[in-house]
C-alpha cells in the first residue's frame, strides 16, 4: 500500500531510540499516523514541528497497519509561529481539535480551513475570528453543525441575533426577545460568509468573544463533556490572548 499527500503536522510521539510516530492532517486521507525512522535526528526535528506542512509518502504492507512516512518540507511555519504566544496556543488548540476527527476520515474542507488559519495565526487582528469559524466548521465535521441560515421559529433570514442552545439553530431578534436570557449570542461576523482579502471586515473584540462563547458551549456539550474533559488549557489561553483578557 502506498499514497502521496500533503500533510499538516498536528502531533508526534517518540518511538524507539530514534524514531517518532508522526500524526498528519491530510486533505485526501484525513488524520493519519505513520512511523518516521530517524525522526528524532537534528536534521528531521525542525521539519516535524506542529504547524508545518509536509509532502508525505506513506507505505505499509497492509492498509490497516501503522506504516511508515517519508517526508519532505513544503511550508515550514513553526519558526514563524514560535515568536507569538497567540500563535503557539493557536497551533496547540488547532492540533487538538483536528485530533478529535476519526482517524483516516477525509475532511478536505477542514484541511483547507486549517491551512488558512495557520497562515494567519500570528496576526492578532484576524486569527481569533478565524479560530471561531474553524471551531464551527469542526463541529459540523463531527456531525454537530449549527444552522445559522434562518430563524428556527419564523423561518426569516434577517435580524438573526441569537442561537438556541437546545437546537443549535439561529433565532431572530423579535422571536428570541422573550427568551433572550436563555439564548446564546450570534455575533454578526458569523453571518458574513466573506473571507479575508475579499472585503471581509475584522470583527471587534466583543463580537469575537461572543463567537467563542457560542462555539465553546457546543464544544463542551458535544465534545468535552461526553469525554469527561474540561475546556482545554490551550483554548482558554488562546481565547484570553485573542480577546484581550490575558
Swiss-Prot record:
Biological processes, Gene Ontology terms: DNA recombination; double-strand break repair
Give the source's domain of life in one word: Bacteria
Q: Name the GO cellular-component terms.
A: bacterial nucleoid
Q: Fetch the Gene3D superfamilies from UniProt.
A: Nucleic acid-binding proteins, Recombination protein O, C-terminal domain
Enumerate the UniProt keywords alphabetically. Answer: DNA damage, DNA recombination, DNA repair
Report whether DNA damage shows up as a keyword of the record. yes
Its family remark reads: Belongs to the RecO family.
Kindly give the PANTHER family that the UniProt entry links to this protein.
Answer: DNA REPAIR PROTEIN RECO
Q: What does this protein do?
A: Involved in DNA repair and RecF pathway recombination.
In its UniProt entry, what is this protein called? DNA repair protein RecO
> Which organism was this protein described from?
Methylorubrum extorquens (strain PA1)
Amino acid at each position: 500500500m502506498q499514497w502521496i499527500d500533503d500533510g499538516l503536522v498536528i502531533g508526534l510521539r517518540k518511538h524507539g531510540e530514534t524514531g517518532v510516530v508522526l500524526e498528519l492532517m491530510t486533505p485526501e486521507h484525513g488524520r493519519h499516523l505513520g512511523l518516521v525512522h530517524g525522526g528524532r535526528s537534528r536534521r528531521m526535528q525542525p521539519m516535524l514541528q506542529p504547524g508545518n506542512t509536509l509532502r508525505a509518502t506513506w507505505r505499509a504492507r497492509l492498509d490497516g497497519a501503522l506504516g511508515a512516512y517519508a517526508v519532505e518540507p513544503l511550508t515550514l511555519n513553526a519558526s514563524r509561529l514560535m515568536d507569538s504566544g497567540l500563535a503557539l496556543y493557536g497551533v496547540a488548540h488547532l492540533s487538538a481539535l483536528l485530533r478529535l476527527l476519526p482517524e483516516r476520515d477525509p475532511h478536505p474542507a477542514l484541511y483547507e480551513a486549517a491551512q488558512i488559519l495557520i497562515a494567519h495565526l500570528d496576526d492578532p487582528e484576524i486569527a481569533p475570528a478565524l479560530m471561531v469559524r474553524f471551531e464551527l466548521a469542526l463541529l459540523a465535521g463531527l456531525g454537530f453543525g449549527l444552522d445559522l441560515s434562518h430563524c428556527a421559529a419564523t423561518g426569516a433570514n434577517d435580524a438573526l441575533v441569537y442561537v438556541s442552545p437546545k437546537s443549535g439553530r439561529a433565532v431572530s431578534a423579535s422571536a428570541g426577545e422573550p427568551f433572550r436570557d436563555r439564548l446564546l449570542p450570534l455575533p454578526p461576523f458569523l453571518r458574513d460568509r466573506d473571507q479575508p482579502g475579499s472585503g471581509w471586515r475584522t470583527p471587534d473584540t466583543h463580537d469575537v468573544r461572543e463567537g467563542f462563547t457560542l462555539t465553546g458551549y457546543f464544544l463542551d456539550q458535544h465534545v468535552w463533556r461526553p469525554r469527561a474533559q474540561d475546556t482545554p488549557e490551550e483554548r482558554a489561553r488562546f481565547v484570553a490572548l485573542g480577546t484581550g483578557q490575558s
